[in-house]
């Protein structure tokens, strides 16, 4: 039997800003400017939008002009701030056949609680398009309308734990990346993958890892164990308080809830976190684990 051997395939060149992955290349002119920029990541359903929205309000309570950008096709990042699901940038652009010059700022920027400005970038339909394009178009619009000139802090609230080139694109604008995680295996496993993505981006962009925000957890023993192993640190801790769940159902932030010891406790922790971020958190040079090593590290003997 004659067998035809194919010549070996040449190795694909590695992209400059990722561990061999295909990354979305952003326009180098799309620089946000002088605002402090934070990207919030974490496992899907862990409370990133709740964390982002309450952090945005806390920053505004400290006198800062804050812009929150939701980067999720569900476009529900800012609904506790605006009390509704606002149209996405992509929805608005489609209405004008992507002629962005026809848009005004109030077509896609909405004012939320305590003056926090809100934008929902949205995303392409499932299975199509690229989230990086959506983020790029959003930043481009904000730049064209000079909306970033009067902003002190930008918060990117990013889809789930997706760290592909598209939804990793906010890292290309961020100063610090924050990870929301619970004290459980799935959250920490996702956090480890996100750490790897952030470290890959930091080779060619200013973004650095800022730390983890422990959420929905009475204890932090597993997070602490992981942090000690890879060189991470916890920036804030929010227990699984029922007032946080109720605030989402009431479509409001914690800063609008009726006063109670738990509400005050959570508010104070958000204000403390906001103040520490404004003061500047040292960059973390964590070394992510191999997947199998996490299985060996976490849990009980």
Swiss-Prot record:
Can you quote the record's cofactor note? Binds 1 [4Fe-4S] cluster per dimer.
Which pathway features in its UniProt record? Porphyrin-containing compound metabolism; bacteriochlorophyll biosynthesis (light-independent)
Sites where the protein binds ATP: 45-50, 74, 215-216, 239-241
Species lineage: Bacteria, Pseudomonadati, Pseudomonadota, Alphaproteobacteria, Hyphomicrobiales
Q: Which GO terms describe its molecular function?
A: 4 iron, 4 sulfur cluster binding; ATP binding; metal ion binding; oxidoreductase activity, acting on iron-sulfur proteins as donors; oxidoreductase activity, acting on the CH-CH group of donors, iron-sulfur protein as acceptor
Query: What cofactor does this one take?
Result: [4Fe-4S] cluster
Q: Which InterPro entries match?
A: NifH/chlL_CS, NifH/frxC, P-loop_NTPase, Protochlorophyllide_ATP-bd
Q: What does this protein do?
A: Component of the dark-operative protochlorophyllide reductase (DPOR) that uses Mg-ATP and reduced ferredoxin to reduce ring D of protochlorophyllide (Pchlide) to form chlorophyllide a (Chlide). This reaction is light-independent. The L component serves as a unique electron donor to the NB-component of the complex, and binds Mg-ATP.
SUPFAM superfamilies reported in the protein's UniProt record = P-loop containing nucleoside triphosphate hydrolases
Return the EC number: 1.3.7.7
Name of protein: Light-independent protochlorophyllide reductase iron-sulfur ATP-binding protein
According to the record's subunit comment, the protein's assembly and interactions are: Homodimer. Protochlorophyllide reductase is composed of three subunits; BchL, BchN and BchB.
Write down the chemical reaction(s) this protein catalyses. chlorophyllide a + oxidized 2[4Fe-4S]-[ferredoxin] + 2 ADP + 2 phosphate = protochlorophyllide a + reduced 2[4Fe-4S]-[ferredoxin] + 2 ATP + 2 H2O
User: Tell me, what is an example of a GO biological process annotation in this record?
Assistant: light-independent bacteriochlorophyll biosynthetic process
Q: Which residues hold [4Fe-4S] cluster? A: 130, 164
- Family, per entry: Belongs to the NifH/BchL/ChlL family.
Question: Could you say which enzyme class this protein belongs to?
Answer: oxidoreductase
Iron recorded as keyword:
yes
What keywords would UniProt list here?
4Fe-4S, ATP-binding, Bacteriochlorophyll biosynthesis, Chlorophyll biosynthesis, Iron, Iron-sulfur, Magnesium, Metal-binding, Nucleotide-binding, Oxidoreductase, Photosynthesis
Residue ranges, annotated region (Disordered)? 1-22
Which Pfam family is one of this chain's hits? Fer4_NifH
Q: Where is the composition biased (Low complexity)?
A: 1-13
Q: Which residues make up the binding site for Mg(2+)?
A: 49
